[in-house]
């Protein structure tokens, strides 16, 4: 067993700097230094108190030692300092595929063994997520919306509205909307091109996806770029406050910036929802209801509150721009790093689609592209873990898990398992044969799986098919996924300026 001094040094190693970057956003100027010291002192006090009442029996699950309450302090500090995703990978690497740690003094199990992950995903007793209640209240997610709503009855009710919008007729019109929006933004490419001919690819993808989300779920005029700024600030606030201790929210100066970021987006969404409400009141007839329409009618019938309607629409609009846009960016980078795969996909596009536009009828025949998307999600995912809480006692792989235990499903690490022929390489050979669900879970499964998993695949196919049919995209010289700085907190985020991640667009000539 390691000495305490070694554990402290490991916990304070600058392996990652998510927390340094997030801390700099909590406050500005002279306040930042004060906050750093105050946060450390408050965390020390919290863990000292937790050590006093924590049960004395030790868990049989492997993990760092308790050390009279110092272990939970160091464990929690690592999650805040390096980010949830980075810390989860560290502990799985160090202690194995089932690990016990502590977050905010609460016992937390990190799972990367496929059988254990699959067990948690399919059981209804793990439909709840964990996170700071005060932090979720700060950003409007506590018992609202769908993503971190832990009021299970209300979550089930709002999920039906999401499911309706993301399947059936909504899914059928996705391809046409994606193709038209991508083409429209490509036609205005000069607006995102600098003097050297480099295109701001991330802004192109984000603007396109916000437009697609608006056309599918809200359908009101909006300013994409202004909304994107607010969405990015909201996301930063979300991942910063998610696992902060509740008592820190007694000090307004510690979370004021994040509260204001959430308020800005909520205010913008309130204006958009009112535009939608007014349009519905003035419409002579409603031939084609959408997600926002159904929610507003539910509010009118007393089924949902105005706050919940607004949060649901907010989450539907923000869900894709910051995850799908980065996923597509990673895919474009992987294509240039694997030119033989790019040639296979282009050949398939020419054969299946040719000079036509992508449609529902031909999209399903893009088999190589689907394998490429799956392999990209396996090899370099944007979101590589999910958070749950046990609502009942259970046994996982022989280990006792008590009610209230936090669970982190490290699916990104699970996807590097021995089932795949080349688990640590990017290779389409990994999907040459059918992969059972228990080994590949990019969108989860079971009662709390991603409700948009089917539409996400359709959107990515349609956008990629349109982009690759018109242009060849080349990153700046020497840029690869390995040398681009990233953080991994709530999801993998690019830690470089958009201007440093531009690409050259060259019109494509078909063979």
UniProtKB/Swiss-Prot annotation:
Q: Please give the catalytic activity noted in the UniProt record.
A: testosterone + 3 reduced [NADPH--hemoprotein reductase] + 3 O2 = 17beta-estradiol + formate + 3 oxidized [NADPH--hemoprotein reductase] + 4 H2O + 4 H(+); androst-4-ene-3,17-dione + 3 reduced [NADPH--hemoprotein reductase] + 3 O2 = estrone + formate + 3 oxidized [NADPH--hemoprotein reductase] + 4 H2O + 4 H(+)
Q: Where in the cell is it found?
A: Membrane
Membrane topology according to the record: Peripheral membrane protein
Is Membrane tagged as a keyword? yes
Task: Fetch the SUPFAM superfamilies from UniProt.
Answer: Cytochrome P450
Pfam families annotated for this entry? p450
* Cofactor requirements of the protein: heme
Query: Per the UniProt record, which EC number(s) apply here?
Result: 1.14.14.14
Keywords tagged on the record = Heme, Iron, Lipid metabolism, Membrane, Metal-binding, Monooxygenase, Oxidoreductase
Q: Which GO terms describe its cellular component?
A: endoplasmic reticulum; membrane
* Tissue-level expression: Expressed in ovary. It is also found in the brain, but not in the spleen, head kidney, kidney or liver.
What molecular functions are annotated in GO for this chain? aromatase activity; heme binding; iron ion binding
One GO term (biological process): lipid metabolic process
Q: Which family does it belong to?
A: Belongs to the cytochrome P450 family.
**Role according to the record:** Catalyzes the formation of aromatic C18 estrogens from C19 androgens.
Q: What is this protein called?
A: Aromatase
